[in-house]
């Protein structure tokens, strides 16, 4: 292991950064530093605001000067870092839109939005490495690791607040494309089924339909039919964990290659049909929202990757 010792940093707090707690602010500034170390340097008085000691719950004000001490951060050896750097570089190729307020990318399948839980690399960590000069980069919403498509990132705290409010008030519209088993009935335009989240002993999250769960609704529209599968457009009205995956399963049409809620026989059919599919066929195709800076209504679309396109073409040819 190598260690890197950065120098003392003085940061002037902007109006956009004001209002947040100092401990949360330090977590954005000291990326990769454990929370325990952040609280230790606060407790020891190594972090100063306007040259004074402060408590972790102190709320920053515009114009505050924050002294951030040098913190030793262990880094992996170069051999271990290089695949990480390749992933960081690849993120630059999937950015769909960027301005001073937001960044939108087409997240690849298989990449987590956050590191952690045994994962060293996530989209947000990669973006921070790609944009080291950015003072603020935070996820507005999440996508499951195996789901690809539109992912929205805020570049200002004010933008994050605005976009989170849109999510709460259902002012943001998300459209997904999913390949499901069998013939989806055109009259089934909505699935309303309460969802309950459980944590298994392994730590794995599993969601099921239960009257004890939270109210959940997904709207559906048939996009294209094939011999033994249907491509459906899914628009979640609520935003529960694994919502689309569980609602399609509940409707009797699980998503292709869903290792948690899917159907192995359906996956085998797809393999034998020569589709080449080996990942969850769930793609966040479009996101509609109001721009937090300009007030303009935006709709950003993310194209499917080549693997999903090839799969659909193979199914069309087999009809």
Curated annotation (Swiss-Prot):
Record keyword S-adenosyl-L-methionine present: no
Catalytic site: 144
Its EC number(s): 5.4.99.24
Catalytic reactions of this protein: uridine(955/2504/2580) in 23S rRNA = pseudouridine(955/2504/2580) in 23S rRNA
Gene3D superfamilies noted in UniProt: Pseudouridine synthase, RNA-binding S4 domain
Pfam family, one: S4
Protein name (database record): Ribosomal large subunit pseudouridine synthase C
Originating species: Escherichia coli O157:H7
Organism classification: Bacteria, Pseudomonadati, Pseudomonadota, Gammaproteobacteria, Enterobacterales
């Amino acid at each position: 292991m190598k260690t890197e010792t950065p120098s003392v940093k003085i940061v002037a707090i902007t109006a956009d950064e004001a209002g947040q707690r100092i401990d949360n602010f330090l977590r954005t500034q000291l990326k990769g530093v454990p929370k325990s170390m952040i609280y230790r340097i606060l407790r020891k008085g190594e972090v100063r605001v306007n040259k004074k000691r402060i408590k972790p719950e102190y709320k920053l004000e515009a114009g505050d000067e924050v002294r951030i001490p040098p913190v030793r951060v262990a880094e992996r050896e170069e051999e271990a870092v290089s695949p990480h750097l390749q992933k960081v570089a690849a993120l630059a190729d999937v950015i769909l839109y960027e301005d001073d307020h937001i960044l939108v990318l087409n997240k690849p399948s298989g990449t987590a939005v956050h590191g952690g839980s045994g994962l060293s690399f996530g989209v947000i960590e990669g973006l921070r490495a790609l944009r080291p000069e950015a003072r603020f980069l935070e996820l507005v919403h999440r996508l499951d690791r195996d789901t690809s498509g539109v992912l929205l990132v805020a570049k200002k705290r004010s933008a994050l607040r605005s976009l989170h409010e849109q999510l709460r008030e259902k002012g943001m519209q998300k459209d997904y494309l999913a390949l499901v088993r069998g013939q989806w009935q055109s009259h089934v335009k909505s699935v309303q089924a309460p969802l309950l989240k459980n944590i298994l002993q392994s730590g794995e999250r599993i969601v099921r339909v239960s009257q004890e769960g939270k109210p959940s609704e997904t709207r559906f529209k048939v996009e294209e039919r094939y011999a033994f599968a249907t491509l459906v457009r899914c628009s979640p009205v609520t935003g529960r964990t694994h919502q689309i995956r569980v609602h399609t399963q509940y409707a009797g049409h699980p998503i292709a290659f869903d290792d948690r809620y899917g159907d192995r026989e359906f996956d085998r059919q797809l393999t034998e049909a020569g589709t080449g599919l080996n990942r969850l066929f769930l793609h966040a195709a479009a996101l509609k929202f109001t721009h937090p800076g300009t007030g303009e209504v935006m709709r950003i679309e993310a194209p499917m990757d080549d693997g999903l396109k090839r799969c659909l073409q193979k199914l069309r040819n087999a009809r």
